Amino acid sequence: MDPARVRLAGLLLAVGATAWAAGTVIVGDKIQEGIQTLDTLTGMLFVVGVFALVWTVLSTRGAGDGWTRVIPAGLLVLLPGAFLLNALSFGYASHDDFPLPLMILDACWPLSQLGMLVLGITVAVKGRYQGAVRWLPLLAGMWFPVTMVAQIFGGSTVSVYVSAAWLLGTHAHLGVRLAVRPVR
């Protein structure tokens, strides 16, 4: 894969993760009240960055050559659904107000995050990347479970800061590494 494209993917991931981390902290506990415009917009930037990462993993065969290519390919189907859900959520006060088609589309978010965990495991096991780039996708894939544990044991405020820190420490970190030294 062209190193310039990998650099761009890294830049998109770093910017998207940083934007969503900042948006998460700024919105804070208000996210519990319903859909927040800043969180939605920065979440869309994050999805664009994650899509670029997954495309890079597929293109560089980071998940392997065999049946494991299905993992990033599946994510390339789910992530546009997550993006579309965010785009279509404007005008609704909360997720409870969604019509049935949006409720169905809403499944793309948690399914894509589960897929990111599976992708992270696969990238780590396959070992096609070296150093931190091998392990950061696994840590990034743990964002959803870590954030949920923080929510359960620490509450909403703790979860906000854990989420932002995890996004910066894993997704943004990985994005910067890819932008500086692209994998092939």
Question: What is each of the regions a protein language model found here?
Answer:
Residues M1-R184:
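Hydrophobic, aromatic-enriched alpha-helical segments typical of multi-pass transmembrane helices
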